[in-house]
UniProtKB/Swiss-Prot annotation:
Protein name as annotated: 3-phosphoshikimate 1-carboxyvinyltransferase
Molecular function, one GO term: 3-phosphoshikimate 1-carboxyvinyltransferase activity
Location in or out of the cell: Cytoplasm
Keywords: Amino-acid biosynthesis, Aromatic amino acid biosynthesis, Cytoplasm, Transferase
One family name in Pfam for this protein: EPSP_synthase
Record-annotated active site: D326
InterPro entries according to UniProt: Enolpyruvate_Tfrase_dom, Enolpyruvate_Tfrase_sf, EPSP_synthase, EPSP_synthase_CS, RNA3'P_cycl/enolpyr_Trfase_a/b
The family this protein is said to belong to: Belongs to the EPSP synthase family.
Region called Disordered, residue ranges: 1-25
Function: Catalyzes the transfer of the enolpyruvyl moiety of phosphoenolpyruvate (PEP) to the 5-hydroxyl of shikimate-3-phosphate (S3P) to produce enolpyruvyl shikimate-3-phosphate and inorganic phosphate.
CC terms in the record's Gene Ontology section: cytoplasm
Pathway involvement of the protein, from the record: Metabolic intermediate biosynthesis; chorismate biosynthesis; chorismate from D-erythrose 4-phosphate and phosphoenolpyruvate: step 6/7
Length: 445
């Protein structure tokens, strides 16, 4: 069963100007999906730029357990020899997805319509997260789920031997739920329809089409209607994974708040369903230039040139939340250094992420001398243009909380310590080396 080693505290101190080129790892969302779709294609899929954080490595291990041949050839270079839609073998062991909500929910979807049984678990954080939001729609296909109280891991799924196509309206904006239903629909006959009231990141739709699935997206009075025709033969692909905009957010935001900084962040995904943070930063007055805009692997990408900026507080509308759900922690840090209040509405989904991210950020920012207001669905940061710092902040085993407070420490008046930096490895193993390479004062302890 997934455990967690001893805590590894880290401290960030006020840093000189950040300068240079920040090479960001591959996009986490696309990396998970490339491995899973590669495993469901017939033949060999080649992947470059794969994120080699623990979350994605756990998904690679899961695909091996279901019978795909997954091989690493070099840094970021992998191949997946797929078994075809409906070709999964029953795993002999428990599937441990570590810290990854995306990994476990997508893999559950991928196996849900095959006549086999699999048991899933994860680390202490993942075992607290609700899985009913995925197992409820999977039950419509005929999948049975047996988990702990509240639909939590460990959980055993018994795949549907005779799946039926499904029409499902996603009750909350969740790309993970949408993607799990679409992946399950691959091995169901007829057409599976997913209706989203609010659009979420569309990597699954782009990549399913790329692998040869018949998929259409229309907008109607109910929202966005995604129709997938089941039982295709997926064709292997060559996937170049763009750089992760959620990981890029950390050096980008650090450069905005550390005086005198100028950095270049090449090859970052500009997918409009993931762009909410950058839209918001520009509204705050951020000096970010998007250079060399191009397309790679069906995704728009650009090089980001970022300079330190005087920022002002803004109101972030709730409809922007799905396109920046992972970026609110780092945005709340930037907001603390802005002049005036930043109001973030429609953020209740943050309460069921790797931690209750609203509570974690509010408590840590308050400890660093920032005035905060919050309710179930709103976070307000009253920026003063400066942050006293000088606190130890709890990360709750959450990689994004850990990185956000370390960025805060780079511009705060007194050092900021996080109680455990080890979760950073789940999404951004090179974070410390990359930031110190740019000039950040960041160290263990």
């Amino acid at each position: 069963m997934s455990g967690h080693g001893p805590a590894q505290p880290m401290t960030a101190r006020r840093s000189g100007p950040l300068k240079g080129r920040a090479e960001i790892p591959g996009d986490k969302s696309i990396s998970h999906r490339a491995l899973i779709l590669g495993a469901m294609a017939v033949g060999e899929t080649q992947i470059t730029g794969l994120l080699e954080g623990q979350d994605v490595l756990d998904t690679a291990k899961a695909m091996r357990a279901f019978g795909a041949e997954v091989i690493q050839h070099g840094p970021g270079a992998w191949s997946v020899h797929g078994v075809g839609v409906g070709g999964f073998a029953e795993p002999a062991e428990v599937i441990d997805c570590g810290n990854s909500g995306t990994g476990v929910r997508l893999v559950m979807g991928a196996m849900a319509t095959s006549p086999l049984t699999a048991t899933f678990t994860g680390d202490a954080s993942l075992r607290k997260r609700p899985m009913g939001r995925v197992t409820d729609p999977l039950a419509l296909f005929g999948t049975r789920a047996y988990g702990r109280k509240g639909g939590r891991l460990p959980m055993t799924l018994v795949g549907a031997a005779d799946p039926v196509p499904v029409r499902y309206t996603v009750p909350m904006p969740s790309a993970q739920v949408k993607s799990a239903v679409l992946l399950a629909g691959l091995n169901a006959p007829g057409q599976t329809v997913v209706i989203e009231r609010e659009a979420t990141r569309d990597h699954s739709e782009r990549m399913l089409r790329g692998f040869g699935a018949e998929l259409s997206v229309e907008t109607g009075p109910e929202g966005q209607i995604i129709t997938l025709t089941g039982q295709p033969e997926l064709r292997p692909q060559t996937v170049a994974v763009p750089r992760d905009p959620s990981s890029a957010a950390f050096p980008v935001c650090a450069a905005l708040i550390v005086e005198g900084s100028e950095i270049l962040v090449p090859g970052v995904s500009r997918n409009p369903t993931r762009d909410g943070l950058y839209v918001t930063l520009l509204e705050m007055g951020a000096d970010i230039a998007f250079e060399n805009e191009r397309e790679e692997g069906g995704e728009p990408v650009a090089d980001l040139r970022v300079r330190a900026s005087a920022l002002k507080g803004v109101e972030v509308p709730p409809e922007r939340a799905p396109s920046m759900i992972d970026e609110y922690p780092i945005l709340s840090v930037v907001a603390a250094f802005a002049e005036g209040s930043t109001i973030m509405r429609g953020v209740k989904e943050l309460r069921v992420k790797e931690s209750d991210r609203i509570d974690a950020m509010a408590r840590g920012l308050e400890a660093c001398g920032v005035r905060i207001e919050e309710d179930e669905d709103t976070l307000i940061v009253h920026g003063m243009g400066r942050v006293p710092g000088g606190a130890t902040c709890a990360t709750h085993l959450d990689h994004r909380i850990a990185m956000s407070f370390l960025v805060l420490g780079m511009a705060a008046e007194a050092p900021v310590t996080v109680d455990d930096g080890s979760p950073i490895a789940t999404s951004f193993p090179a974070f410390t080396d990359l930031m110190t390479g740019l000039g950040a004062d960041l160290a263990a302890g």
